[in-house]
Amino acid sequence: MSVLDDVTEQQFEQNFNAWLDSLSTGATPTPVLTETGTVTEVADGVAIVSGLARALADELLVFASGVHGIVLDLEPGRLGIILLGPSEQIHLGETVYRTRKVVSVPVGSALLGRVIDAMGRPRDTLGPIDAIAEHPIEAEAPSILNRTQIFRPLATGLKAIDAAIPVGLGQRELIIGDRQTGKTSIAIDTMLNQARSDVLCIYCAVGQRGDAVARVIRALKDGEMLQRCIVMSAGDEEAPGLSYIAPYAAMTMAEYFSAQGQDVLVIFDDMTHHARSYRELSLLLRRPPGREAFPGDIFYVHARLLERAGQFGADIGGGSITTLPVVETQAGNLSAYIPTNLISITDGQIYLSPQLVRKNQFPAVDLGLSVSRVGSKAQNRTLRGVSGNLRVTLSQFEELEDFARFGTRLDDVTRARLARGSAVRTALRQAERDPMSALEQLAVLIAAMEGLFDQFNEQKINDAMRLVRDAAQQQLAVIEQRIIDNQTLQDDDHTLIVNCAQKALSIFDQPATNTK
């Protein structure tokens, strides 16, 4: 007897109808549409792709070889792509795929203490990065209504800057100067000084040699600041596309922390290499060159990056992003295209003079050509009373110094003013990796302005500054509290500092003991 003999015709019909219903209501496979293009040209760092008519500007593409690229030029039947990997891996006729995404990088506290590339991939030996999320590198700058006034100082630990060219949290202050004038050293010392605060740091090296980046990492390790820093490196040996996107990636990481209410310091070292990378890519893509062969939108490229910095309101986290972009000049030419662009975008500049370098004046900050347009409002009131007299004293000294070169006979008053100015300028010298607290800066500058260093030579002034710094830390707790409370310095406080410095320097007045 067959099994079918036990199934009635009615049951069979019911089962058959149920099977048909399941087919009609079940999921049916749908075709997957994949848009592809073809590589028609390859150059160093760029590729030309045909097809992909629906690709969007700044969209991330993937080549069949695994290399990624970004759409930079959109033309009928032709896409200009900047490569984020070695162009040697790409060949003519290779297939290119759309991702319908933009370039994104990991964000979060897991990046602190790590060395990464422009895509957020680890370059150290600490293993993979467990990031919280990925954010696109391009973002709209916060509106005016989402910003607040810059009202808090960023302490660099450098006397010449904190006293005369103060920087505020949320400010964009340009560091500008020729090669080998100490631009990166100022950036490193500023990061190291944040060990006294809660500011997080991001160092973005664009076009720097590997040994230069290694020195920065070593300095941060020695200063116990690496665990609160992110070091991003996009060297000259890598694809120029990575150098182009690196500052935007660093800013995206900073925006994550500022949205959590934290203060972030971002160093772009340096924007000259960034501009050159963008010029190289633009020329290879046959974009019309402009002044100094830079493309016409180079100002916008830098402005849209730096406008993302600022002091933000509580509605978007209440944090801040302070940027210190570095730019290199040629023979002190401040009127070159990229330097003038960045000077007009930023809130001030710290100019490092080659003439001061030749005089062994480090940091070689030229106070006459340096300015902070908003930082003075955020400067500590205790230091504010010193900064005005400091600038006047140095400017008068430089005028007299030029006059004295003619060999004119000088009277006693002029010689005294020259001695005072020379002592004050020497007092502004500061060794690398030796950041000073606000109290130490105040004590040293007041001692110099009051003429306590006038009779010393350069070596003795260095020793005298160390004595004054130590004495201030031990005896001026009241003044330190005034600095913390952001109070104005009183006459009695000024006298207290002078007396403390005089007592510390009295060791130079003691006769040497004769030990036989």
Curated annotation (Swiss-Prot):
It catalyses: ATP + H2O + 4 H(+)(in) = ADP + phosphate + 5 H(+)(out). The record marks S370 as: Required for activity. Keywords: ATP synthesis, ATP-binding, Cell inner membrane, Cell membrane, CF(1), Hydrogen ion transport, Ion transport, Membrane, Nucleotide-binding, Translocase, Transport. GO terms for cellular component: plasma membrane; proton-transporting ATP synthase complex. The keyword Translocase applies. Its EC number is 7.1.2.2. Coiled coil: none annotated. Pfam families: ATP-synt_ab, ATP-synt_ab_C, ATP-synt_ab_N. It is a peripheral membrane protein. It is found in: Cell inner membrane. GO terms for molecular function: ADP binding; ATP binding; proton-transporting ATP synthase activity, rotational mechanism. ATP binds at G177, D178, R179, Q180, T181, G182, K183, T184. F-type ATPases have 2 components, CF(1) - the catalytic core - and CF(0) - the membrane proton channel. CF(1) has five subunits: alpha(3), beta(3), gamma(1), delta(1), epsilon(1). CF(0) has three main subunits: a(1), b(2) and c(9-12). The alpha and beta chains form an alternating ring which encloses part of the gamma chain. CF(1) is attached to CF(0) by a central stalk formed by the gamma and epsilon chains, while a peripheral stalk is formed by the delta and b chains. Produces ATP from ADP in the presence of a proton gradient across the membrane. The alpha chain is a regulatory subunit. Belongs to the ATPase alpha/beta chains family. This is ATP synthase subunit alpha 2. It comes from Nitrosomonas eutropha (strain DSM 101675 / C91 / Nm57).
